[in-house]
Amino acid sequence: AEGSPELPPASLIVTTGGTGPAPRDVTPEAIENVCQKMLPGFGEEMRRASLLDGVPTAILSRQTAGVCGNALVITLPGKPAAVRVCLDAVFPAVPYCIDLIGGAYLEGNEAAVKVFRPKKKK
């Protein structure tokens, strides 16, 4: 809008819902159409965490992630409890992934989550 300051580009886009097998669940297909690279390891880890949390239907989920420009796009399930399990599982890798794809440098709050960063070579 005219007179509005320009917003910086997003480095992380998170969606919730639309990742199941029902006909209306099309979120994974939508991001596959706009992302340049898909990161299937995110979905694999989210399903693993959900299975370990005692959710046998986690195998029906189609969560995934992809790279869209310099942004990481992550699809999450629609249920709030499942969102928590899935975010807890993948978030340690998010700041480093965003750094690798040229997005903003994100700091982590060590009290909340241990963020992974590779050790620098000396």
Where are these regions (language model features)?
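Non-catalytic beta/alpha edge segments that cap or flank active sites
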Residues: 1-122
